[in-house]
Amino acid sequence: MKSLLKTLGLFIFFAVPVCLKAQTMEESLSKTLMKMDSVQNLSEMMNVSAQFDMLAAKWENEWSTNYYAAYAKIIASFIVQDNKKKDLFLDEAEKYFGKVKTIDSQNDETWVLAALITNARISVDGQNRGAQYGGIFNQNLSKAEKINPDNPRIYYLKGTSLFYTPEMYGGGKALAKPLFEKAKELFTKEARTSVLKPNWGEKQNLDYLKQCDEK
């Protein structure tokens, strides 16, 4: 019995810090994401991105911290106006993505993140980068879809791609709308039990649906 208690005592001694670490990381991510939701300009976004950088440095081997550090860089690239700076942000996002992929390449959100980075690259110069990155974008979403076909962000990103593609090249609102509708349905089914699982995109998806109905 004494031996068993010693064993249990050791287990508790080692298990408790692990739990506390996980809670601390989750709480830190949650607080930073709340700040990100209220960002009004590039300066505020840069501050949030710097906080995610610190979290990724503190928990360098965690999928979630590296994921959100990359995600923040992508959002910053959409906000900044200078194209060179956009690419610099995306270069930093790529570095974090490398860690994300190494930690868990079988996570569908890993490949959705890859597609989002590629989408951001295209948005810098759509006319000249569409051919360069379009195939990579589709490949990344295909990987995500094979792992989890019920991820709404897959169809949201497919929809945005078609939305901004001219009709003469096989895009347009009419083709994008069914994808946004599918994403909307899947967003309503998505569980939001933890910040460790990404759940972004629902509000933006609804905005695109409204634009699809505008004449």
Residue ranges with predicted function:
Residues 38-52, 85-96, 130-138, 177-184:
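Helix-turn-helix repeat elements of alpha-solenoid scaffolds
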Residues 24-36, 58-80, 105-125, 151-165, ...:
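Amphipathic alpha-helical repeat scaffolds of TPR domains
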Residues 175-178, 182-215:
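Terminal, low-structured helical/coil segments at or just beyond the last alpha-helical repeat
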Residues 87-139:
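Hydrophobic, well-structured mid-protein blocks that either form specific transmembrane helices
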Residues 1-29:
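Bacterial Sec-dependent N-terminal signal peptides
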Residues 129-164:
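A contiguous pocket-lining binding segment that forms or flanks enzyme active sites
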Residues 55, 100, 143-144, 183:
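Canonical positions in the second alpha-helix
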